[in-house]
Swiss-Prot record:
It holds the Pfam family CT_584-like. This is Protein CT_584. Belongs to the chlamydial CPn_0803/CT_584/TC_0873 family. Gene3D superfamilies: 1.20.58.1050, 6.10.250.1130. InterPro entries: CT_584-like. The lineage of its organism: Bacteria, Pseudomonadati, Chlamydiota, Chlamydiia, Chlamydiales.
Length: 183
């Protein structure tokens, strides 16, 4: 016999207060503190009730209603999920990994007897950078990054991280072998 989850009692004003505050937060560009602002709003709207705070976090971050709600409140909750789940997830990602590389693209140009690469890097936080390299600079950059991976291998956490990307390392090896055979 399955038990029906208990119905959570939430003041109707909580949904209005939450919606108003979330609209205010996301009316400006998402930055490193946006997720913290979201956390503060949830804690304030929960008025010290940990169970309610957990419910609101799960609802807004993962789109899940962990407990039953009355029909009207369920509709309000679904509306908040539709409006704010994605911006909240983006804010969380920027908060946790904002400076990490999100995307890299390169274009190759021929310039006076040499190949030049226009490398565009986009970070999780949306900032973009242009890095121009030629073949020699590209090799220097690869050598530097490979030495960083070798350094990571000497650290237990780094070694574990490298084991997790073994397929990528095998692919790199194959690419290096292909490059050295053709030169």
């Amino acid at each position: 016999m399955t038990t029906k989850p208990k119905t959570l009692e939430i003041d109707n004003n909580t949904f209005l207060l939450l919606e108003g505050n979330l609209k205010r937060i996301f009316a400006t560009p998402i930055g490193y503190t946006t997720f913290r602002e979201f956390q503060n709003v949830v804690f304030n709207c929960a008025q010290g009730q940990q169970e309610l705070a957990n419910f609101l976090f799960e609802m807004l971050i993962n789109g899940k209603l962990l407990q039953e709600l009355p029909a009207g409140q369920k509709q309000s909750a679904q509306s908040l999920i539709v409006q704010f789940m994605m911006p909240i997830r983006v804010a969380k990602d920027i908060h946790e990994r904002g400076e990490f590389i999100n995307f890299i693209t390169s274009d190759m140009l021929a310039q006076q007897e040499r190949c030049v690469f226009l490398n565009r890097l986009s970070r999780v936080d949306g900032q973009e950078f242009l890095l121009m390299t030629d073949v020699q600079n590209t090799c220097h950059l690869i050598r530097h990054l490979l030495s960083r991976l070798l350094e990571a291998q000497k650290n237990p956490i780094g070694e574990k991280n490298l084991q997790e990307i073994q397929e990528d390392l095998d692919s790199l090896r194959a690419h290096f072998e292909e490059l050295t055979k053709s030169v």
